[in-house]
Regions:
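An alpha-helical appendage that flanks or caps ligand/catalytic pockets
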Residues: 1-4, 43-145
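Amphipathic, non-transmembrane alpha-helical secondary structure
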Residues: 20-24, 40-41, 68, 137-140, ...
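Loop-centered beta-sheet repeat module
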Residues: 5-43
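Active-site-adjacent beta->alpha loops and helix N-cap segments on the catalytic face
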Residues: 37-50, 162-167
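Hydrophobic faces of well-ordered beta-strands that scaffold small-molecule active sites
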Residues: 11-16, 31-36, 53-61, 154-157
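Structural motif
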Residues: 28-29, 149-151
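Alpha-helix-loop-beta-strand connector modules within alpha/beta enzyme cores
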Residues: 166-181
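Active-site-proximal loop/turn and secondary-structure-junction residues that shape catalytic pockets
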Residues: 19, 39, 61-63, 160-162
Length: 181
């Protein structure tokens, strides 16, 4: 570009990091590889984290002060849908996408108040990333745990409304407070 941009203003380059080929391309380009995370407890239990500093994750967030309210909002926004489930199953049969198969396996763990990691939107072909659902504090804790295993870049699924973005902002503020030095 002419004139050259200051380095701080250069845009980041992101590449899908869900396959070995994508990871190799990201390394070669000096880009950040973006993947779909497992539940953070899996990284913590294994004792080995991915090269998270070189990776970003994509998630959705639905949170409220009260976890029950968050789950009500989540289920209303992403109701189970037989047509979506069939479309998802068909996509699984015809796709050679590694990330699609990985995410489908992750959906086998049910979400609960103990586990905010929720795959129903993906399993019903409504979006293509896991969601974290629960109280502001529980979801902020989960995000801070992802930071704890090394992730530094989080890309959010599109919020449903400006109000939803405000709720996500509360979670981000609380997560930042937990990981601040």
């Amino acid at each position: 570009m002419t004139p050259a941009l200051p380095p701080a203003l250069l845009p980041g380059v992101f590449v899908s990091g869900s396959s070995d080929a994508g990871l190799a391309a990201a390394r070669q380009l000096g880009a950040l590889a973006v993947s779909y995370p497992k539940p953070v407890a899996e990284y913590e239990a294994s004792g080995t984290a991915p090269d998270a500093a070189a990776l970003g994750i994509r998630i959705g967030i639905i949170a409220r002060e009260d976890a029950d309210e968050a789950w009500t909002v989540a289920r209303k926004r992403f109701p189970e849908d037989r047509t979506g489930q069939l479309t998802h199953q068909l996509a699984m049969k015809v796709s050679d996408s590694k990330w699609h198969k990985q995410l489908s396996r992750l959906g086998e763990t049910p979400a609960s108040s103990e586990q905010p990691y929720w795959m129903v939107p993906f399993e019903n072909y409504k979006t293509f990333c896991p969601y974290l659902v629960g109280s502001y504090d529980r979801v902020a804790d989960e995000i801070s745990r992802y930071v704890g295993v090394g992730y530094r870049t989080i890309i959010l699924d599109v919020p449903a409304s400006p109000e939803e973005l405000d709720h996500i902002g509360v979670v981000c503020e609380r997560a930042a407070a937990r990981v601040a030095p």
